[in-house]
């Protein structure tokens, strides 16, 4: 209660994020690197981490648990003949850094415009334009920003955490910086940049 539907937390004994879903919460728990995946996924360890986050007299019901290995990839080209790629099929980034779903929606929006024009008689070369417009945005914004978000979230050094919080606070206190940050993090800036590529 009292939490945002998406909550990222730094704490002394491990960072975590919470995502509210219908009738349940998804917890992404970060475990110390010295633990094996088996140790990290033990029922008792997960229960203890959840109790640290939200103390309860009852054990938490765990629907699924798995280790996610962070990796990022991007295809060379978003189209090959009549094969078209968008979203995670075109660019894969850490879900803890965000950006992937919205980036995929932006891919789909751009591609839909091209397909509509082709349906109405334009040349198939528009599919090459789709790839030229979306790939650099994925490289420079989606993957880069997701990686920065993930690194900030997993930072353990208290001094670096304080610095990151101070930087975020400075952004919120400056209307120009705030607007610039929002345009980038909402990926509106990327949509505009993509439209300039011919």
Question: Which residues are covered by each model-predicted region?
Answer:
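Core Rossmann-like FAD-binding/catalytic domain of the broad FAD-dependent monooxygenase superfamily
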Residues: 1-198
């Amino acid at each position: 209660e009292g939490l945002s539907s998406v909550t990222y937390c730094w704490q002394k004994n491990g960072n975590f994020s919470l995502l509210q879903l219908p009738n349940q919460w998804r917890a992404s728990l970060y475990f110390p690197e010295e633990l094996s995946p088996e140790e990290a996924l033990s029922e008792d360890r997960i229960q203890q981490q959840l109790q640290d986050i939200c103390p309860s007299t009852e054990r938490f019901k765990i629907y699924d648990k798995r280790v996610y290995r962070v990796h990022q990839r991007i295809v060379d080209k978003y189209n090959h003949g009549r094969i078209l790629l968008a979203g995670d099929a075109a660019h894969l980034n850490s879900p803890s850094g965000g950006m992937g779903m919205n980036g995929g929606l932006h891919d789909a929006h751009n591609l839909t415009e091209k397909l509509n024009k082709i349906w109405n008689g334009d040349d198939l070369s528009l599919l090459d334009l789709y790839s030229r417009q979306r790939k650099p945005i994925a490289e420079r914004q989606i993957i880069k920003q997701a990686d920065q978000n993930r690194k900030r979230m997993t930072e353990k050094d208290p001094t670096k955490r304080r610095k990151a919080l101070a930087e975020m606070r400075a952004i919120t206190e400056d209307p120009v910086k705030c607007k610039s940050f929002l345009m980038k993090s909402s990926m509106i800036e990327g949509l505009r940049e993509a439209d300039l590529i011919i």
